[in-house]
Amino acid sequence: LKKLENDEFFVHFSFDKNVFLSFDEAFILLQNNRVIGGGKVLNPLSEPLKKEQKNKFLMFLKNKDFKAAFSFLKDAHKYGFGLLSSYQRFKLSHQKALKLAKELNQVFVDEKNLNVYHLQSLEEIKNFIKFILEKNPYAMLSAHSLALRITWASENFCELGLKKMSNLLDFQNGIYFKKGIDFEKLQEKNNNQMYEILKKQGIKPEAPYNLYDFLELDRKSGDNILKKLTQKGLVVRLSHNLFIEKQALEKLMQECLNLLKNQSLDVQSMKEYFNLSRKYAIAYLEYLDKFPQVNKEAEKRFLTNI
């Protein structure tokens, strides 16, 4: 990569197999069992950097100027860099690495998740929040829901982004929502929308998390909405992630009972007759088992003589 003074070089090694190395670890090079060179590891992890940048970073490491190295990584990694492997990379404990990171300018240090973010990247989170609100003014947001969608951002960094938008957002019951919207009406509207979607989807409802994403709901709010709809008897929960509108379920069960007058039902026949996935077919058959006139033999269902 670069020739230094005293016959030293920065060298990049490529290996056929994964090799665990750590900062400042000594090594020797052998050829035909003879030593032809040696040195110390500076950067044990591969960094997607151009040659000039890589040489600059390696010089910081060679001089053990870790503050400069951290500052370099902060600028080089748009979406933050981690300190989880700080001992392997710099021979620094987590505590020392965090302390050093806090001395940098324009950074947010997530101590819990051991991440360091340039504050400039906060704008991307804020822009994403604005995009959500433009698409759906009735969105219910949380740091947790944002972190699930912004894969590079930790929950704590997303929380900072939400707090920085107090001019656009109100906060109540752990939920951020568009300023000026009544929270009770917001909940009611999302309840109604969730029910209408499930009603429209019939016997093939989407998984809850997909519905939450569509309505821009954080998972806690979405779970609460489904819980309320279930308590009101409008929706029936058949499994961990299968909620079906009650009337659609009742209609399906009636169709199944009518079919049982002339044939048996099993997973395969349910899949074929109703065009269902195996998961849905099993859930509906298990619900059908609750009917007293249905008898299960092996994996087939029959009508009893009662």
What are these regions (language model features)?
Residues L1-L30, I36-L45, L49, K220:
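Charged, often glycine-enriched C-terminal and inter-domain segments
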Residues F20, V35-I306:
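C-terminal non-catalytic scaffold/interaction domains in large multidomain proteins
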